[in-house]
Amino acid sequence: MNRHLYDEEALMKDYPLAARTAHPEGTVIPVGSAAIGGENLTLIAGPCAVESREQLFATAAAVKVAGATILRGGTYKPRTSPYAFAGLGEEGLRLLAEAGREFQLPTVSEITDAALLPQFEEIDILQVGARNMQNYTLLQALGRQSKPILLKRGLAATYEEWLASAEYILREGNPHVILCERGIRSYQSGTRATLDLAAIPVMQGLTHLPVLVDPSHASGTAGWIPALGRAAIAAGAGGLMVEVHTNPAQALSDGEQALLPQDFARLAADAHKIWGLLHP
């Protein structure tokens, strides 16, 4: 255990803006009709990738009915293979913004390069993916604009490194940072990643920033997402980020870890029940 991490004086020295010591009350981030943090359960849902207007709108309609508070959709996809579908780019952003307006849901999409910022003008939340968690030039650029940033934990990032990345954004003047645990790389290969449930209470003790969990990337398999999602809420997470697709078998990206709308609806209902027990 790194006891230095839990020393308040050291925390204030290394993370003066992110440390809970500097901001004892948890941060609440308003995003359109939603609010992230505090007593608000956040349910982000939608396809891994925007594939077409028909696919996106069908999924958006379904997750809205199921209880989603924010619509997700990937448009610039940093894929492991250069031959994999990498998203629709600017056209995907246009469709995502249109779907957000149609179904009255704030939107979130991953940004991979600061040069793309003008294209994200109509997107409500900018996501920094695990691969870019330590892209400090990107973090600084995002800190100089006002949209909320959803900062995913890197594949092998420590708590300190994750906090430091948040500090990069905060230091540039943007106070709206949301942390998202999405699983880390470990020695086992039975799941896509290993969900670090301990990160939830630990990070909530260290920082005032909201902490969400992405059980889709942690599991890599749709059948395990509900269990991990329920566990995350029970551990104190402020919400979930879940991949949902109306036809996962035909998905162009990560279909194996996408829930059907009806399965997401059941997970959302379970999450609300658990949330109600923790926040009576």
Where are these regions (language model features)?
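Alpha-helix-loop-beta-strand connector modules within alpha/beta enzyme cores
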Residues: F85-S109, A141-P148, L197-L212, Q257-H279
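Hydrophobic faces of well-ordered beta-strands that scaffold small-molecule active sites
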Residues: L41-P47, T69-G73, T107-S109, L126-V128, ...
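N-terminal amphipathic alpha-helix/helix-capping segment at the start of soluble metabolic enzymes
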Residues: N2, Y6-I44, A269-A271, L277-P280
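Active-site mouth loops of central-metabolism enzymes
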Residues: L41-A58, P82-A86, P106-E110, G129-A130, ...
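Glycine-rich, proline-tolerant flexible connector loops at the mouths of alpha/beta enzymes
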Residues: R72-E91, T246-E256
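N-terminal small/glycine-rich loop or linker at the start of catalytic domains
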Residues: G26-C48, K77-R79, Q204-V213
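Catalytic alpha/beta core domains of metabolic enzymes, predominantly
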Residues: I36, Q145-V244
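Catalytic beta/alpha-barrel core
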Residues: L88, F103-A115, I123-L139, K147-Y159, ...
